Amino acid sequence: MKSFNEIITEAKDVAKREDPYRLVVLAERPKKISKTGTSFKLTQKAEKLGITTYNCRINGAFIQFDEDKQIVTIHNEGDEKGFEMDEDTIVFIRGDVTRKDSYMDLISQIERYGIPCNNTRECIEVCCDKFRTYLRLQEIGMNQPRTVLIPNDSPEAVDDAHEALDNKFPMVLKTLSGSKGVGVILIETERSLQSQVSLIYKIDPYTDILLQEYIESDYDVRCVIVNREIVGAMKRNKITDDFRSNASQGAKVELIEMTELEKEECLKAAKGVNGQWVGVDFIPAKNRVKQSPYILEVNHSAGSKAISEAIEEDITKMVLKLYFDREIWRKEPKQCGVLETFTVDGQEMTGKLDTGNSTTVCSLH
């Protein structure tokens, strides 16, 4: 029988492996994306690096578990064979996978089987909701544009939100979900504010809207982070005759050197949403060295095309290479043991009996 020290040593050796791994690219519509899309590029670059890949369309995907062989497989709709997900497999999640609860439940299944993902379900749910992101970052004291929720289209609700931002125009109106600059409107008058809110709620009465302080700037910055490490940053210049600076809307991008304070704040934001591979967007302060930037949002599925052009290096290849180091693979913690109710000196109590029988890992106390 092996000693405890031998077991621990073996675990460390496994973690330090840097040979090719197995990769599942789980995306909303991988069949329809262009060849310049990040999902396609990940698959293409991974194969050149010797990484075995499986491109999985989340709509219709399902997981099977063979209890006898202890094998987990993920399947595209109509694919009976599927793809085996073992301890050497990681899942990269791309796109807006929050459209249906079943999509998120599939991610939870993957996590429960101990398969690591580039971002957790928790991270994705926070990042896909702009107000939830705002609240999470507010909890850790991040500098952000002042933001309020407009719960409905009543004049009172709109006025309250307007007053909370000191009645100063212009303001920015945003839907809680949406990316690439979609669902973001610059509001310059009170009349425009009420009409836009009414229009949005007429189209979808169950939507949620944010009103946000407008920060004057000619550009914003996208910083890409993998495992608490900044792998690239780009300056996105404001589009002509538009206040937005999204590269997907035509904004010109270029390399930018971040200050140490900006780096610290971006890393803090990524950690705040529990993100491992994320893009952090911010507007620099007037004094970039001494003043914290305004954090705008954190993107769990940041694109690769614009940032690769800005830093003149393929960021998908950089990310794939970083994950060769198994030490950065992060699995969601699993509860082990069972809760039991018992009586001590006439009083009923609930305690946790940790036998190790309800988990695939060993717990030591």
Where do the protein language model's features map onto the residues?
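A short glycine-rich, hydrophobically flanked beta-strand micro-motif that places a catalytic Asp/Glu
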Residues: 212-213, 275-287
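Short beta-strand micro-motifs enriched in acidic
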Residues: 224-226, 283-287, 354
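C-terminal active-site "lid" helix and adjoining low-complexity regulatory extension at the edge
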Residues: 4, 10-13, 257, 271, ...
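Active-site nucleotide/adenylate-binding loops and adjacent lid/helix of ATP-dependent enzymes
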Residues: 20-32, 36-43, 73-75, 81-86, ...
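Aspartyl protease active-site motif detector
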Residues: 338-365
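Protein kinase-like catalytic core scaffold
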Residues: 171, 232, 278, 294-297
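ATP-binding N-terminal substructure of ATP-dependent carboxylate-amine bond-forming enzymes
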Residues: 2-118, 156
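Phosphate-binding site of ATP-dependent enzymes
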Residues: 182-269
